[in-house]
């Protein structure tokens, strides 16, 4: 299996925990094609959390890393609540800081209470709602 196929499988499996208003309609081959395009496109950056045989999670953002806009953060359901999401976010935060960014932002499904709680526990705050179903959450960086 390719990275794109593994990412597609993980996102499809984990998406059931998002409480989406509209479920994904993509098939695994369609998602794999989408991820093949993203992984080869210089406009996206993806950080993988993986072991010798498993992909545990991933985080993707636009190439303008300093903007801090996370497009996707998914953890394999078998490995949720083990700190992998927090580690991926800490890595992304460091990448944004290195590039001179001052915040990190993510859109969360309004019904995804687990994710809202997760981001809130990491000092993200709700800043707006868009498209009736996404909460924009942001964490501002403050220099000590």
Predicted regions and their residues:
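A short beta-loop-alpha structural element at the N-terminal edge
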Residues: 1-9, 128
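Conserved GNAT-fold acetyl-CoA-binding loop/helix
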Residues: 12-34
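Short loop/turn motifs at secondary-structure junctions and domain boundaries
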Residues: 36-42
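Conserved beta-strand in the GNAT
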Residues: 48, 54-62, 69, 74
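A conserved beta-turn-beta hairpin within the catalytic core of GNAT-like acetyltransferases
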Residues: 62-71, 80, 130-133
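Conserved acetyl-CoA-binding loop-helix of GNAT-fold acetyltransferases
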Residues: 75, 81-94, 117-121
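Conserved GNAT acetyl-CoA-binding A-motif
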Residues: 89, 96-107
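C-terminal "cap" of GNAT-fold acetyltransferases
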Residues: 102-144
């Amino acid at each position: 299996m390719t990275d794109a196929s593994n990412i597609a499988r993980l996102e499809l499996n984990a998406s059931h925990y998002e409480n989406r208003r509209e479920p994904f309609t993509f098939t695994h081959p369609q998602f794999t094609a989408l991820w093949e395009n993203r992984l080869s496109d210089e406009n996206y950056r993806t950080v993988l959390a993986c072991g010798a045989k498993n992909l545990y999670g991933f985080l993707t953002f636009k190439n303008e890393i300093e903007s801090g806009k996370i497009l996707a953060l998914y953890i394999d359901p078998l490995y949720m609540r083990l700190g992998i999401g927090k580690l991926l976010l800490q890595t992304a935060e460091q990448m944004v800081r290195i590039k001179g960014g001052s915040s990190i932002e993510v859109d969360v499904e309004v019904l995804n209470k687990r994710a809202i709680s997760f981001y809130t526990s990491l000092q993200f705050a709700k800043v707006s709602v868009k498209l009736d179903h996404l909460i924009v959450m942001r964490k501002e960086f403050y220099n000590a």
